[in-house]
Design a protein with these regions (language model features):
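Bacterial signal peptide processing site
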Residues: 13-15
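Sec-dependent N-terminal signal peptides
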Residues: 1-4
Length: 360
């Protein structure tokens, strides 16, 4: 997640990242969600007659549709919406944290971000408010740190709510592999968000600047490398800030399962950690690899390739999300559902009158 101060006198309009059925050509999921994949429960959100519930891996209803919205389970709990308020349920479908918040985010490291009247704090899994609702905005915890925005700027807090990195930044990204991207303006604070944006660098968990602010864009560290932008091209640095894959890509994404998406002349392909082109740029869009498959966009349709670049699930979907615990969410016209790695539908709105919703 990236948090940016837009205007110190106005409330931030950004909301916590939620998983949803992405629009056509939209493949990319946040790196923070990638990190949480191993903590997901094997239940999948579905909808029936305007209410949402859950199916299991086989496509059978596990929790009867009864919620206005239902999110994926993470760390054993899932966000649900009832009568315009948000709370949490367990895998049995029982409400364990009463719907009472205007906004929530998924649990991460035992705490969940919650919002009331455009202010943010954190609760534990009992629903106890462990960090008072006080911040203009915040992010979920990652490696013991959460981004927190105050009227002074953007900094980081620890799980007790203590500011451990002062709010002196204009933008910040979640910690990943011990480092977090930060950005500050030469013009200082306060400032106009439309002035020259200066550069990004990286700090460690103590707030020490370990990679100087020198890049126009940065991504999170993943598998030891981070994509960065210099002079309009993207390459990769290591955790010491050394450029190990030269910046000659129009776009470069995070590494996942040993490969990273890159873009050259409007086409997308994949490189390995040595910078070698493993799958030549040939796709109109592409996603990160998850469970051995990656979504790609060909001639206005989405399908899936394996790590050799072979198309193993025909490009036939209007949108296709990454595989998570053996299933992927796809859409064809009004038909939405989940497929297995063979491309077979496990569940479909066409024959079960179910559909997915976006979180509003």
């Amino acid at each position: 997640m990236v948090i940016m101060v837009l205007n110190l006198t106005a409330s931030c309009s950004l909301k916590p990242n939620q998983a949803s059925l992405l629009p056509e050509k939209a493949f990319f999921a946040s790196s923070s969600f990638q990190k949480q994949r191993q903590e997901l429960v094997g239940l999948y959100p579905i909808q029936l007659n305007g209410k949402m519930g859950y199916m299991d891996f086989t496509g059978q209803v596990a929790i009867a549709p009864q919620f206005d919205y239902a999110d994926r389970f993470v760390e054993g709990l899932a966000q649900v919406k009832i009568n315009n308020k948000w709370g949490f349920i367990n895998p049995a479908g029982s409400i364990v944290i009463k719907p009472q918040f205007d906004e929530t985010d998924r649990f991460s490291e035992g705490l969940a971000l919650v919002g009331i009247k455009d202010r943010w704090g954190f609760i534990d899994k009992t629903g106890k408010l462990t960090i008072p609702i006080q911040f203009d905005f915040a992010s979920k915890f990652s490696q013991g740190r959460a981004i927190a925005m105050t009227k002074k700027g953007v900094g980081f807090i620890d799980p007790t709510g203590k500011l451990v990195i002062e709010p002196t930044y204009f933008e910040a990204k979640d910690f990943s592999e011990g480092l977090a991207g930060v950005r500050i303006l030469k013009t200082g604070f306060p400032y106009d968000c439309c002035v020259d944006p200066n550069f990004w660098g990286f700090v460690d968990r103590s707030g020490k600047e370990v990679i100087p602010l020198q890049f126009r864009l940065v991504d999170d560290f993943s598998e030891g490398l981070a994509a960065v932008s210099i002079d309009g091209k993207m390459g990769y640095i290591d955790q010491k800030g050394k450029m190990v894959i030269e910046p000659h890509f129009d776009y470069a994404g995070s590494f996942s399962e040993g490969l990273a998406i890159i873009k050259i002349k409007e086409k997308w392909g994949y490189i390995n950690r040595k910078g070698k082109m493993v799958i030549e740029p040939q796709f109109d869009n592409a996603s990160y690899f998850s469970e051995g498959l990656a979504g790609v966009y060909i001639d206005r349709k989405s399908g899936y390739i394996d790590p050799t670049g072979r198309l193993v699930i025909k490009a036939q979907f209007d949108s296709a999300l990454p595989f998570i615990q053996g299933l992927a969410e796809v859409r064809v016209g009004d038909r939405e559902g989940y497929i297995d790695p063979s491309g077979k539908y496990v569940w479909s709105s066409q024959n079960k009158k179910f559909s997915r919703l976006r979180k509003k």
